[in-house]
């Protein structure tokens, strides 16, 4: 091996000499750049392996007039290298220096005009893993990173190419990039050395680099901590094994922007906030501040009664005519185009904000005067009109203005005075409204961090290659209200955590919602929380729980679940679980029976009518029947007068198949806007009364199940290849609930859809982002404000010839029901749940001991003794359900491996 390595390095040196190449060595890597500007080689000197791809790429390039000009020649001129870029008329001088651990490429001078971008360095690399945030490609053996040495360097990955660019709008001359090419186990050590050598941000917590600190491994509770509830919240946090409590921005302050202390929650003002943090510190807990980077609330003093001039505008024009204080139409001298987040537009004229519902060219129509607490007043022709940039219903600070610094001073000042230990920069991605996101996303984050005088655990959304340095870890996105387990595996771990892993940034698996029962989602249950806890242990990742004190108190199983989470957290931090066991826990579902002992477990839910029979599959050995059985609402039959008609096709409505260019899954085939009158529908749908009465948003809170009558024609398909139609409810805030119909039948059929199919959304039908965001179908949903029914294809076999027509869609009325003396039987035994259970109540039994009966929020109603229950044999089992009176239940069979 040593002989082969020596020959490889010698051959590289010979080739370099022949081609008049320039060779740059660190202790572990050798970069060779040809005199024609091509990056010819990057070798791992420890084993002689080439790290560049076979196709040759110039080591640098410029963009001018939209065209890329690769470096075409490089020559040494004293201590510098002079680089020419083809026929661009541009050249540049570089200083390239090598140290034991890294190379530094510095742009010392640019000759020529019209430069739009200079790629200080670019390498087409072979390692498989791509960290596009940090500009690093890596595998288990070797890592290659182009790390900018200032905020003005844009490191990124495009396909296989790692590059670092500078732009004239920020700064070019004097900018530097470090090439870190090292064995992967040494990568973070070298990064820390680069941070020290070039005085880059390199925060520590308790003297340890923040990313490797104990704090970065600990979990936190994200909740509404106040003066009044501090003791209770601390108790819950300690119960769950949390080391931090993160306070919502809306809890500690009243509005975004100037962030006044919320006197309702902290009657003693800033002193009260400090006293709560001091109390947490005394209890061994640290406290984090949640804020929303650069957003300014419409109720904030920076907006009302007089808007700050530093609010960001995304378009400006001038008033074409005089207007008085009552006119609701403005005529501008020129049109502004459409705002990024659509109509309506908020515009500021002098010191008045007008909320204009429509625009027509240069006209602003249906304007509400004196909006957001400003005063309506007359304005003269020629007055400047500025359209206020909006994101998520709030305004933004112009990060080029003094307002940005004022906000940063406010936040850092509060941190320093009251003793926060953590900051969560939420909404950072919205700062792309100011300009290129790679730069502007991190600007205010850095201002705040730089002015804070405390060790801070930094997290947030919207990370850049530069703010990577101050972030201690990442967060794996918001919580899902439904399909919690699938959301964790298919999104949080597969997408978000993979992103952070690829970029060498630790991650925690939050946020997980800790919820109480509402019409759109059930209360959080112990098996959902244990699913998170198991993955937390498997991946050695912290978790954050997002909730509020009301939900913690409402969920009757909070104590049980938090104690379980705390036990898992202690086990994880102890390092007692062997790596081989943790690797097993990363897949499937598991249950801890005692500390450190885990068994595979399945929770298989299905609806069942009482009286009736269902089949249960036990994939493990023989065992006692374990179950959760919940009373569901009784559904009216299709055609019942209490049902709500959503769609009636006269004649049946053809659901057109996807076109050749349509992107799947989730392409929209038809849409019914329920809030519009029949005559305003842009389709052949007949919705509601045939007289064309005005439509309205529907309250389906008690009509959440759907019935659809379909006519399906075409060749039969295998069930795995069958077409799947999505009857999607849309709420007024563009959130959704997906109801899937597998078109495995032919002919006419009425299909009942008792609940959404959220568990299939990510596992089978992740929608194309151009159709709709999957998050909008799994987050909270307002059944009380349903505005549309969308028909979407989630799967459609190409050239299948399938035709589908819809004749009727109804939302079925729900009626409360009650069950008494529920019996579950197999051939060998019967178990009885004595007493009554009403809609939403559920009974849970784990094969021995007592049966516990809970309300929908997990509040224990009673505990009843259980007789010897049925046994499940390995394989298929028939279970019979009986009770006093008919009803529908959801039975969850719980099976475990011994």
Language-model segments: residues:
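Autoprocessing Asn-cyclization modules and mimics
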Residues: 293-377
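Aromatic-lined carbohydrate-binding/catalytic grooves of carbohydrate-active enzymes
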Residues: 213-215, 219-316, 389-412, 416-434, ...
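Extracellular ligand-binding interfaces
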Residues: 667, 673-777, 802, 810, ...
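Glycan-recognition surfaces
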Residues: 302-314, 391-406, 449-555
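Carbohydrate-recognition beta-sandwich/jelly-roll modules
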Residues: 24-245, 267, 279, 283-287, ...
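Extended, low-complexity, turn-rich repeat/linker tracts enriched in Gly/Pro/Ser/Thr and Asp/Glu
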Residues: 112-114, 633-638, 698-700, 711-721, ...
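Carbohydrate-binding surfaces of carbohydrate-active enzymes
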Residues: 276-291, 295-297, 311-316, 535, ...
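Intrinsically disordered, low-complexity segments enriched in serine, threonine, and glycine
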Residues: 332, 372, 377, 381, ...
């Amino acid at each position: 091996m040593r002989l082969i390595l020596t020959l490889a390095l010698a051959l590289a040196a010979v080739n370099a000499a022949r081609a008049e190449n320039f060779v740059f060595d660190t202790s572990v890597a050798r970069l060779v750049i040809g005199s024609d500007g091509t990056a010819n080689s990057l070798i791992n000197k420890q084993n002689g392996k080439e790290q560049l791809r076979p196709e040759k790429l110039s080591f640098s390039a410029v963009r001018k007039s939209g065209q890329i000009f690769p470096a075409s020649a490089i020559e040494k001129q004293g201590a510098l290298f002079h680089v020419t870029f083809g026929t661009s008329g541009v050249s540049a001088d570089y200083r390239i220096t090598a140290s034991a651990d890294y190379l530094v490429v510095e742009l010392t001078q640019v000759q020529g005009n019209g430069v739009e971008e200079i790629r200080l360095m670019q390498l087409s690399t072979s390692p498989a893993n791509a960290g596009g945030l940090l500009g690093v490609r890596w595998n288990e053996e070797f890592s290659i990173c182009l790390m900018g040495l200032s905020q003005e360097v844009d490191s990124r990955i495009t396909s296989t190419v790692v590059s670092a660019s500078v732009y004239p709008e920020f700064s070019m001359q004097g900018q530097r990039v470090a090439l870190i090419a090292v064995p992967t186990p040494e990568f973070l050590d070298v990064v820390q050395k680069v941070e020290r050598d070039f005085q880059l941000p390199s925060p520590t917590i308790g003297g340890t680099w923040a990313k490797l600190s104990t704090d970065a491994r600990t979990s936190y509770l994200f909740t509404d901590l106040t003066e009044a509830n501090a003791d209770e919240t601390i108790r819950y946090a300690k119960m769950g094994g949390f080391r931090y409590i993160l306070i919502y921005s809306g809890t500690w302050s009243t509005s975004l922007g100037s962030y006044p202390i919320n006197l309702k929650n902290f009657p003693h003002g800033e002193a009260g906030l400090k006293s709560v943090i001091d109390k947490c510190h005394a209890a061994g807990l640290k406290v984090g501040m949640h804020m929303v980077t650069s957003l300014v609330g419409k109720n904030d003093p920076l907006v009302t009664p007089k808007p700050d001039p530093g609010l960001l505008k995304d378009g400006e024009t001038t008033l074409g005519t005089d207007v008085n204080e009552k006119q609701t139409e403005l005529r501008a001298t020129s049109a502004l185009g459409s705002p990024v987040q659509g109509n309506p537009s908020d515009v500021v004229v002098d010191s008045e904000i007008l909320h204009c519902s429509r625009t027509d060219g240069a006209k602003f129509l249906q304007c509400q005067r004196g909006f957001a607490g400003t005063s309506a007043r007359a304005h003269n022709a020629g007055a400047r009109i500025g359209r206020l940039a909006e994101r998520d219903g709030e305004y933004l600070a112009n990060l080029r203005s003094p307002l940005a610094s004022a906000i940063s001073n406010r936040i850092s000042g509060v941190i320093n005075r009251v003793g926060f230990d953590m900051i969560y920069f939420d909404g950072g991605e919205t700062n792309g409204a100011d300009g290129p996101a790679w730069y502007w996303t991190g600007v205010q984050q850095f201002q705040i961090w730089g002015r804070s005088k405390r060790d801070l655990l930094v997290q947030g959304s919207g990370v850049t290659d530069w703010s990577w340095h101050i972030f201690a870890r990442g967060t794996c996105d918001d919580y899902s209200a439904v399909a919690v387990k699938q959301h964790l595996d298919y999104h949080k771990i597969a997408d978000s955590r993979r992103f952070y892993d690829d970029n060498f940034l630790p991650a925690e698996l939050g946020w997980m919602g800790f919820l109480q029962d509402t019409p759109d989602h059930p209360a959080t249950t112990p098996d959902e929380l244990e699913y998170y806890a198991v993955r937390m242990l498997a991946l050695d990742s912290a978790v954050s729980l997002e909730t509020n004190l009301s939900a913690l108190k409402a969920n009757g199983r909070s104590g049980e679940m938090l104690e379980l989470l705390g036990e898992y957290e202690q086990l994880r931090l102890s390092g007692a679980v062997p790596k081989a066991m943790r690797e097993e826990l990363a897949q499937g579902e598991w249950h801890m029976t005692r500390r450190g002992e885990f068994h595979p477990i399945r929770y298989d839910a299905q609806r069942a009518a009482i009286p009736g029979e269902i089949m249960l599959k036990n994939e493990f050995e023989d065992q006692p029947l374990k179950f959760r059985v919940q009373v569901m609402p009784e559904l009216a039959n299709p055609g019942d007068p209490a049902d709500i008609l959503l769609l009636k096709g006269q004649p049946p409505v053809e659901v057109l198949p996807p076109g050749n260019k349509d992107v799947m899954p989730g392409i929209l085939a038809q849409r019914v806007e329920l809030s519009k009158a029949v005559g305003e529908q842009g389709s052949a749908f007949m919705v509601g009364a045939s007289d064309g009465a005005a439509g309205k948003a529907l309250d389906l809170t008690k009509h959440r199940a759907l019935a659809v009558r379909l006519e399906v024609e075409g060749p039969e398909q295998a069930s795995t290849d069958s077409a799947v139609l999505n009857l999607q409810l849309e709420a007024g805030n563009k959130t959704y609930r997906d109801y899937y119909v597998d078109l495995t039948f032919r002919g006419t059929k009425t299909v009942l859809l008792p609940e959404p199919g959220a568990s299939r959304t990510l596992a089978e039908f992740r929608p194309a982002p151009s159709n709709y965001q999957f998050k909008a179908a799994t987050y909270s949903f307002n059944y009380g404000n349903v505005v549309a029914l969308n028909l979407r294809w989630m799967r459609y076999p190409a050239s299948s010839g399938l035709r589908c027509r819809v004749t009727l869609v109804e939302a079925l009325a729900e009626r409360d029901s009650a069950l008494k003396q529920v019996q579950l039987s197999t051939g060998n035994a019967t178990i009885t749940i004595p007493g009554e259970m009403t809609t939403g109540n559920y009974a849970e039994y784990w094969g021995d001991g007592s049966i516990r009966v809970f309300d929908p929020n997990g509040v224990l109603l009673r505990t009843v003794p259980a007789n010897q229950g049925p046994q499940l044999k390995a394989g298929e089992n028939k279970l019979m359900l009986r009770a006093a009176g008919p009803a529908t239940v959801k039975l969850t069979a719980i099976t475990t491996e011994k």
